[in-house]
Amino acid sequence: YTEDSKIIDVRKEGEYAAEHIAEAYSRPLAYINTWIKDIDPKEHFFLHCAGGYRSMIAASILQARGYRNFTEVEGGFGKIKLTEVPTTDFVCQSKL
């Protein structure tokens, strides 16, 4: 990881809005068929979700469509939070 790394966050929009890697792009797994065409097959990127399951699904879909230019982050955002990777401040998404 470097500050110039491209990061794709496949969590739901609300999860991303609550807290995310500072430079990550929100691309929910539910809409992968919409955003997959925007991926540059020559540019490396990191792929993550909350814990690893959704990014594993996204990785399988990407690989099935010929993409090999990514690294799936094992453990997802939970593990990322334990590192020095900069994240946004948490914003509660619950409304009373």
Model features per residue range: what roles?
Residues 1-96:
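Rhodanese-like catalytic fold shared by cysteine-dependent sulfurtransferases
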